[in-house]
Amino acid sequence: MKILDCTIRDGGYYTNWDFDKNLIEEYASSMEELPIDYIEVGYRSIPLEGYLGKYYYCPIFVLEELKKLMPSKKLVIILNEKDIRVEHVKNLLLPIKPFVSLIRMAVDPKNFERAIDLAKAVKSLGFEVAFNVMYMSNWKNDPSFLNLLEGLDD
């Protein structure tokens, strides 16, 4: 079993993905001391309308600094499947490969087939891949979603 912490990424919903530098340093120091394997630090995205802070876009300099602060941890970013397509993957992810180990994808079960194609593109670049399937209570309304799970360990 592996443990993933998503405190920063999830906290971004309350701070517009901006965090005080001292807070990040204290958080990173704490994470280095804990038996957590993966640290999900934010999103990586194409430009979107409206203001979203640097932890929504996770530019290279942010990831580089986080990796220095947490050298023993595997960094994770999340992609919002509704905004990201296969054609975005190389430009978004290749520059961050030295710093990020795992890419998670936030996905609505109704878009899961499209998310599988996105996951294959991400995996082809050498990243670990995981899904953050949203609206879990709706699975029973779409039994076809469960059928798509077969063979995903490949």
Residue ranges of predicted features:
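Hydrophobic alpha-helical segments
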Residues: 8, 25, 116-119
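Alpha-helical scaffold segments that flank or form the walls of functional sites
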Residues: 23-36, 65-68
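N-terminal glycine-rich anion-binding loops that anchor highly charged ligand groups
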Residues: 1-6, 29-45
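Short N-terminal helix-initiation segments at or just after the protein's N-terminus
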Residues: 12-21, 43-46, 101
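Glycine-rich anion/phosphate-binding loops
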Residues: 16-26, 107-114
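N-terminal small/glycine-rich loop or linker at the start of catalytic domains
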Residues: 1-16, 72, 128-134
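Conserved, mostly hydrophobic/aromatic
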Residues: 11, 31, 103
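Active-site beta->alpha loop and helix N-cap motifs at the rims of alpha/beta catalytic domains
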Residues: 38, 43-152
